[in-house]
């Protein structure tokens, strides 16, 4: 069952709520962070959360099992 919303930190995909939301890696100030992001993410969503960073294209995503 999902418990995280878009922009929240996560450990794996199924934690993230939303059909197109995955747990992906972005870089914030050179540091890796795992956040719930849209699969088709663009920076608008991340900017909304103050995470102005570059999204890894088709970034790493994490499975819980």
UniProtKB/Swiss-Prot annotation:
Keyword Secreted annotated: yes
Domain of life according to the entry: Eukaryota
Keywords: Disulfide bond, Neurotoxin, Secreted, Toxin
Tissue: Expressed by the venom gland.
Post-translational modification: Contains 4 disulfide bonds.
GO molecular function, a single term: toxin activity
A GO cellular component entry from the record: extracellular region
Main location: secreted
Transmembrane segments: none
Role this protein plays: Intrathorax injection into crickets causes paralysis prolonged for more than 60 minutes, followed by recovery.
Family designation: Belongs to the neurotoxin 25 family. F7 subfamily.
Protein known as: U15-hexatoxin-Mg1a
Species this protein is from: Macrothele gigas (Japanese funnel web spider)
High-level lineage: Eukaryota, Metazoa, Ecdysozoa, Arthropoda, Chelicerata
